Amino acid sequence: MKKFKVVSDFKPTGDQPKAIEMLTEGILKGEKFQTLLGVTGSGKTFTMAKVIENVQRPTLVLAHNKTLAAQLCSEFREFFPENAVEFFVSYYDYYQPEAYIPETDTYIEKDSSINDEIDKLRHSATSALFERRDVIIVASVSCIYSLGSPEDYLNLTLSLRPGMIKDRDEVIRELIRMQYERNDIDFRRGRFRVRGDVLEIFPASNTDRAIRVEFFGDEIERITEFDVLTGEVIGRRNHVAIFPASHYVTTSEKLKRAIKSIEEELEQRLQELRSMGKLVEAQRLEQRTRYDIEMLQEMGFCKGIENYSRHLTGRPPGSPPYTLLDYFPKDFIMFIDESHVTIPQVRAMYNGDKARKDALVEYGFRLPSAYDNRPLTFEEFEEKLNQVIFVSATPGPYELKKSSRVVEQIIRPTGLVDPEIEVHPVKGQIDHLIGEIRKRVEKNQRVLITTLTKKMAESLTEYLKDVGIRVRYMHSDIDTIERMQIIRDLRLGKFDVLVGINLLREGLDLPEVSLVAILDADKEGFLRSETSLIQTIGRAARNVDGKVIMYADRITKAMQKAIDETNRRRKIQIEYNQKHGIVPQTVRKGIRQIIEATISVAEEEEKYESIEKDIVQNMSKQEIEEYIKELEQQMKRFAIELEFEKAAKIRDKIFELKKLL
């Protein structure tokens, strides 16, 4: 069995060796909760990788959004090239949940667009857990949402070997039960085709490789793996396990039981509604549910099948749904990255889902069992955990209370220290700020300014422009691609100052930034809490000249705590550097690690984009349609490679082109 093996030029330095040793010891001793308090840029991902290598256990890494999950997945793939590093996030490109608004009598049907590539990656993740132990899955919070039963998923797996006595038609019937679809012409993921005694299966977890099973009578003669595009044989296989094409598969016996159970619940609910005089709601519910039952009897599935997941899995009412966590072996470990954001997000999921379903159940659009197709409650989530390491520069009260040990990682491998903090009175703040900006511009460095309101940010941006400073304002209405473009332009030096309200989102750890100015630092609220202030201060921690100026007339509790904590860390870092003769260096490279779309691309790209605009304007309608198809293929390829910013950039370009049709 393969073991986890970190492949890297880095050696643990600074606080890393101690952190790795202590966290490993905690896991081996069976401690349930630990916290890695690691400052920005201290190499937390590398520490996590070394701990995984030490304990050799299947691992789930939880991130609070898709972009961060993709970045972590890329980093772990670099550290573990010989192991299975998988990616599990929501597969919806677009999702409008089913809802009912009683005030206007408006029913909104569920509408969604599923990203086929991400669905493939999800299948790859779950199948890897049943095939091997050297598995790391990087997931977003969508992993606490309902997924099919792991028991049914495993029981319906098709295991084939050469020499096995198995009838071809029997294998076909099994594939159909696993929700594979027969299509002899359009051969793609989740489908199979038959040519005489040859059966070709395209597994749900693959993009480019399929399995060819050759029969001789009732015996499997040969199994080969081949490239779907070229038809070239990759190799012969002595054994192959085909996993179901859907996570919501169930056996025919369970389906029959589920239909009976749905009918019983329907009768009970209809009696309740009629006794309350809700005749319209009762009629609506009966009509919709009977149609779904018919579909389940005839086809084995129906639209919105997930709303009947409790019946399909045979769970009692109110019991927790099956999720990705149930697919892991009992001894798995979990890292919760940026836990100060991720934990509150996990807490909020259940209530949001329940509030939306209340109206659907009350007005006869769904049976009460629809409540059981839901994310886990926070208490259920806690029960499913085995051993957890919270990872954050600013752990929240929950993490600190739960953890048996808090391991600090304060020393950065680059020798960089936390920035110096200055508090300046509000009177004359703008003139003072302009003076500080000019000092940075002379050194070819950049400045981030955070304000509390949109109005203040807009006024400040206009004022700075009027005095000749090259400044841009980044607000919440800016889409992902434009946001990446702004960050890239800041790094390229097309402007020097970026003004924003919330500068804590991913992608803003920029080495060129040597000054962070916090206006209204003494106005208490979530943007000026201790956690937010420490995170904002960290934005200046990648430059050797890093400095933070807080503009305030008084020092609040949150400010004092943030200043004290930063000074404490700074003292430890400076002492370590002096003791070991380390001279801090601004991060020069690592642009790719910050965020893919901010890479300093040469000016050639811009020339190309302007030429492309001219060409598109002269294209015929048919040529634009063909160009859109080409771009869609490129977009899918980038999605496979986890280059989501590039894929999103192409998606936005496709939207613009479709407007021209």
Swiss-Prot record:
Q: Does the keyword Zinc apply?
A: no
Boundaries of each Helicase ATP-binding domain copy? 25-178
Name the positions where ATP binds.
G38, V39, T40, G41, S42, G43, K44, T45
Q: What is its main location?
A: cytoplasm
Q: Does the keyword Phosphoprotein apply?
A: no
Q: Which InterPro entries match?
A: Helicase/UvrB_N (IPR006935), Helicase_ATP-bd (IPR014001), Helicase_C-like (IPR001650), P-loop_NTPase (IPR027417), UVR_dom (IPR001943), UVR_dom_sf (IPR036876), UvrB (IPR004807), UvrB_inter (IPR041471)
Biological process terms from the Gene Ontology for this record are: nucleotide-excision repair; SOS response
Ordered alphabetically, the record's keywords are: ATP-binding, Cytoplasm, DNA damage, DNA excision, DNA repair, Excision nuclease, Helicase, Hydrolase, Nucleotide-binding, SOS response
Family, according to the entry, reads as follows: Belongs to the UvrB family.
* Name this polypeptide is given: UvrABC system protein B
Give the species: Caldicellulosiruptor saccharolyticus (strain ATCC 43494 / DSM 8903 / Tp8T 6331)
